[in-house]
């Protein structure tokens, strides 16, 4: 629903040169002029799609795809947004991938906290150098109380192999504090962008950094998260839903890597409330603006807390499925199973809920309120209209 005044301001009704996607083209023009877009999160009516209609499968009318791409390119041109390409996302008819022009491929400083488990770290670092196509990066290994002699021999070898792009800095703190480690490592970063990365990850897609930087460079964007897979090729991270389980949860967790997800959400870039810091890219200036990670969250929820603060500062967080890595989660630290770890976790949950009570009550604008917030799989929990 929109006003006649808005349609006139946007240049009039549907244009038939975009036949097949003429409504899409109109909506793009409307968004350029609208002050705000409002979505009513209730099932107000049902839409029946017939076989062969674009509502059921746009591939039934391929000319619609070409018209949609043309409409989107025209939209970018009117808005002054530089793009290299717009293409249909394979297997997801009606969804398009935009390759934004990277105006300036600024240096990415990759911060990797690490403590022994040198084989995991070697896999991570070797995959970065062997598979990454991004032209300017540095790796900062944040040494955290390692004991094994082979760890330090590996550090020396890595620095000799990559003298210009890899350095090791030693954190003098005790125990494990992911926030403090990254805040310490950030002091040594020379890049325009910071990439927080766990040492138990492995790069899959060569253009992973290009895919993340093309969004992180945009003024409106804060954090950018990647698609992370478990070793069995199921989803570990595809964006974080705010309020799931009373705090936050990973959307589509344990879905097969090949799944389209709910409404194709595993196939396209989208705004999300938060991302995991296991692989998180952000401009260094924003990291400094919000004060880095909160060191009172040693292990859990430091990333979600950070993302909330980035949102409160006026930025949008993004998930892209086109940057993919394996994440051998918690291998290097162990799971929170001991009584002490459970107590620490429960304390962090309580503190998080108290700090962000207002935001939790308001809900996640990237999730329809008709989803069951006790689950991460987009199960419906339809609320009747009163």
Language model segments and positions:
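Conserved nucleotide-sugar donor-binding catalytic segment
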Residues: 1-73, 282, 292-297
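A recurrent flexible, glycine/aromatic-enriched loop bordering the glycosyltransferase active site
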Residues: 1-5, 17-19, 177-180, 187, ...
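Catalytic donor-sugar/metal-binding loop of nucleotide-sugar-dependent glycosyltransferases
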Residues: 18, 28-47, 70-89, 287, ...
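C-terminal, non-catalytic tails of nucleotide-sugar-dependent glycosyltransferases
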Residues: 61-108, 222, 232, 244-271, ...
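Short, well-formed alpha-helical segments that are part of the catalytic scaffolds
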Residues: 117-132
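Acidic donor-binding segment of Leloir-type glycosyltransferases
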Residues: 129-174
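Short aromatic/hydrophobic "clamp" motif used to bind/position activated sugar donors
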Residues: 194
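Conserved donor NDP-sugar-binding/catalytic core segment of glycosyltransferases
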Residues: 201-247
